[in-house]
Structure formats: structure tokens, C-alpha cells
């Protein structure tokens, strides 16, 4: 299993209850595709560089997951179908990117 960063931008106008429903759906989707969440950074509402669906802000969630197979195809394509999900980005986490070489 490899480690990936899963970054999501959600609709910024979600209530706390709707946000919890979206988080539960995301985690269920990850589990159903054989991924395990190792870390969740709930960044919250942030201003975006350009509007997405006429919104200047987005609610950011950044997951670190361990998954096998092709999470871009399996997980991201499923999450993109949700109405409240504005953007999905899956990036393979490589340890050599985190260490600075002199």
C-alpha cells in the first residue's frame, strides 16, 4: 500500500450538519475502496485564487491516506460525483519530497 494526499474543496456554505454528512460519506468511500485514513487536516473555509461554481471561498479538507490500486480512478471519481464537492486532488506522497537535500 502506498501513501497518498487527498485534498478536497467543498461547498463553503454547508451547515455543520451537512459538513458532517459529507465527511462521513468521504470516510465511508475511502473504507469501501480499501483505503485507511492516517491523518485529517480540517482547514476550514479559505479564500480561493479564482472562483469555482461562482464561489470565492471553499471548505478545505486534506487527508493523508494509505491505499492500494489506483485511488485517482477509484476514490476520486466517486467523490467528484457529489454535489457539494468542488475539487478533488490525489497526489502520491513520496518521502524524498519531504527531505531537503543539501
UniProtKB/Swiss-Prot annotation:
Keyword Flavoprotein among UniProt keywords: no
Signal sequence coordinates: none
UniProt GO molecular function: small ribosomal subunit rRNA binding; structural constituent of ribosome
UniProt keyword Heme present: no
Biological processes per GO annotation: translation
Alphabetized InterPro entries for the sequence: Ribosomal_bS6, Ribosomal_bS6_sf, Ribosomal_S6_plastid/chlpt, Transl_elong_EF1B/ribsomal_bS6
Family: Belongs to the bacterial ribosomal protein bS6 family.
Protein name: Small ribosomal subunit protein bS6
Source lineage: Bacteria, Thermotogati, Deinococcota, Deinococci, Deinococcales
Gene: rpsF
Amino acid at each position: 500500500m502506498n501513501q497518498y494526499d487527498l485534498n478536497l474543496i467543498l461547498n463553503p456554505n454547508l451547515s455543520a450538519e451537512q459538513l458532517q454528512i459529507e465527511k462521513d460519506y468521504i470516510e465511508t468511500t475511502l473504507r469501501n475502496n480499501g483505503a485507511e485514513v492516517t491523518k485529517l487536516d480540517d482547514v476550514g473555509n479559505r479564500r480561493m485564487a479564482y472562483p469555482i461554481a461562482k464561489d470565492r471561498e471553499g471548505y478545505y479538507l486534506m487527508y493523508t491516506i494509505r491505499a492500494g490500486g489506483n485511488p485517482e480512478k477509484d476514490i476520486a471519481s466517486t467523490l467528484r460525483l457529489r454535489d457539494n464537492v468542488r475539487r478533488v486532488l490525489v497526489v502520491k506522497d513520496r518521502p524524498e519530497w519531504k527531505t531537503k537535500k543539501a
